[in-house]
Amino acid sequence: MATEAIVNDRKEIFGWAMYDWANSAFSTTVGTVFLGPYVASLARTAAEAAGTSTVSFFGIPVAPDSFLPYCISFSVGMQVLVLPILGAIADYSHLRKRMMQIFATIGALATIMMFLLTGGLWWLGGVLFIIANLSFGAAIVFYNAYLPDIASEEERDRVSSYGWAMGYMGGGILLALNLAFFIFSEDIGVPGDLAVRINLASAGLWWIGFAFFTWARLRPRHAAKALPAGETYVSIGFKQLKKTFSEVRHFPETMKFLLAYFLYNDGIQTVIAVAATFAAAPVIQGGLEQDQTTLTAVILMIQFMAFFGALFWGKLAGWIGAKQSVIVSLVIWAGVVIYAYGGLKGDSVTAQFFILGVFIALVMGGSQAISRSLFAQMIPRGKEAEFFAFYEISERGTSWIGPLVFGLANQIFGNLRIAILALIFFFIMGLILLPFVNVQKAIGDAKRYGENNSSGAQV
């Protein structure tokens, strides 16, 4: 039975936000901190043992530091094919919550299996990451699609920011525990590589464990529609997707925003995804190389500061408007990559790295939380999961163009500073496109479309 009329329920909103608390462990402990440097280290060892500068993945020579960025790109390429279909199925059926549960479980189990990464199994790290990241993105489609259902329009900026803030806090707490364990692991007789593997697996346990708070409090939404004769959920998913593509002309401003978001969020997600590899790589010029403890401490600081940053940007959006808030954040992001290219040198490099982290923390949560709530107002009722499937293609940890650009720039120039600077393209494109998005027209188009189709068949 549908419960669409119940909105702004504090218990349900808390349960919804707890999923951000749960799955952010994957983003921080796995995606941002430990997996990239660890897999790159295993791959470098394998390359050195073979007497080459690359490793072979299914016969393809790959630079060790480029391997995981390529895996990110491949996993998102898979999402481009799969997520829109899943979104269409979810909007047609009553399975939104169930599908969220299934993919969260698959992702968590793949993450737990990262404990097995030893010796020459660097390639398994890539395979498990692809499975986990694909599942992470699929579950987030259904999670985001709940936002218009659980929060009224005037509350969405606040609720979206609250979800992101909970994610930063949850991911930060586990990261703090993992950092403490990593620092003192040798003192208690645990080798460093084993400590990393335990930390990776802990993210999967955290993910699946705290997700039960979400399952207990999140209500099923949208009653199922009867399938037409001869149709299955898969076939109707393809047809709904085709219909969505044919109807995008009704939402030109929403599509303009989605294009801008696709570009600038690629930049944001790539900076986050490659930060650990960038800072820890021995080939960085100017003495930037950071040990794992310093690197993790900086990212931990970012996590906790981002909790307050996300809440601040929710307030800022109320003062100057959501679109203007995102534009301000993109200017700061552009400054971050410029400084990563030209700065971070000299005797104070560690202090500079912390200062750069402060600016990242300031904008990281705000640019994403406000983008999500803004997009939620631009889509018609009944098509939330379909539209959020397209949105998720460029969501956190699932960018594909950015990691590909970063990986290719590093492989071509052999310089990670040039690779990080190349990402400024995405922020510049966002700054160019966003001013042309008419937010009020987008909201009006979505409302009129929903009203015109409310008495008809599923839209």
PLM features: residue spans?
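Juxtamembrane intracellular "pre-TM" segments in multi-pass secondary transporters
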Residues: A2-I13, R219-L259, Q285, G456-V459
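Short amphipathic helix-loop junctions that connect adjacent transmembrane helices
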Residues: V30-D65, A273-T294
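Helix-to-loop junctions at the C-terminal end of transmembrane segments
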Residues: V82-L95, F308-A322, N410
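Cytoplasmic membrane-interface "Motif A"-like loop-to-helix N-cap segments
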Residues: A90-I106, G318-I332
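C-terminal ends and interior cores of transmembrane alpha-helices
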Residues: Q101-G120, V331-D347
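Hydrophobic core of transmembrane alpha-helices in multi-pass small-molecule transporters
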Residues: A110, L121-A139, T350-G366
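Glycine-rich segments within core transmembrane alpha-helices of 12-TM secondary carriers
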Residues: S160-F182, E392-G402
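C-terminal transmembrane helical hairpin of 12-TM major facilitator-type secondary transporters
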Residues: K323-Q368
